[in-house]
Amino acid sequence: MATCQVHLPCPTFYRLLLTANAASKHYLSDPNKAVLDALNSITLTNPSALLDAQNKIIYRNPSAIAHPENVSVVCGGGSGHEPGFAGFVGDGLLTACVAGTIFASPAAEQVRTCLQHRLPAKSRGVLVIATNYTGDVLNFGMGVEKARALGKKVELVVSGDDVGVGRAKSGKVGRRGLSGTALVVKVCGALAAQGVDLEDCAKVGRLVVDNLVSLGASLSRVHVPGRGIEEAREEEERLGPGLVEIGMGVHNEPGCEKVKTDLPGLVKIMLAQMLDQNDRDRAYVRIEKTDDIMLLINNFGSVSNLELGAITNEVVTQLGNGYGLKPRRIVQGTLFGSLSGPGFIISILKLVDTELGAGKSLLNLIDAPANAIGWPKCVTAETWETTYDSSPQKTEDYEEMTKPSNLKCM
């Protein structure tokens, strides 16, 4: 296991630890109503989306789909991970999303209903993306088999990108699905929008999964609305004061280790677990200095934008100094949350060749336009690829250009 020098916690970490119990206070006490209201809000903020409330399905209005013959892309899972995945329903991303209750997979019948009744009839196939958790794999898998029995052409891609639980402990279950799943959705949604066939969409989706590594860290476990305050206290005490948990899952699953360190020390440990090829238990993807990568810094939910920016800065600095890696694209924000968790996830995607030709590289697909409320409005590919001046003009240069004033002090 990767190790690092231990430091005293920085003031920011102390502040978050002291206020973590505030996460047990919520505006809504009924979790079922909270889920339905949140799903309905998507139809308010995205007029092209519809809600099947009985089955908790958000789907695109058929009249909003310009090419109904294209492959449909469906994802889903438990609620509480907003904006993933209902917030990704829209042009260039998902055709539909099937939601469960908080941190619980939707039922197989919900999935079957979505595949049979909530997608364009002319679609040349359906790509279903499920995160690698037992309930999701089981229920989405059963829903897919039911749809196939009805004559639907369906492919299932299971997304697992976590390195927090190594091979020895994960066994045949494999890696848990984390924020890297958002990149799988983005790539597959862009391919489907370009009219690529189902087999190639599924092939590239699995290619993305195979080249993803993600790792989370959190200062506290989250409290689910509707559950007792005592449970929140127990969760907090389980972690212990002054500690950050590395490898914590998005459903409060325990991590791989608890450390007392500052941000640079934490990032050093995390990147080592993600990229160290000598760690045979976690070396899932070989990434060399010559490889192109994309970086996603994902917010669990309650890390401030200020602190998330500082985390991004530290990760990029250490990637360059320690590994000789410079991300071709960087996305920062909340894509796959964990309610109000005070944590973050680092996801790194190795930009390998899709073998689909011009305009269909992973970089092209990440850059492709998307029209959904949950996908961040990023700067353009042109902005990323333009070479700019390395540094601003020195202050002294401006001073020399400024004419002296004739004003005199009295």
Language model segments and positions:
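N-terminal loops that bind phosphate or other acidic moieties
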Residues: C4-M410
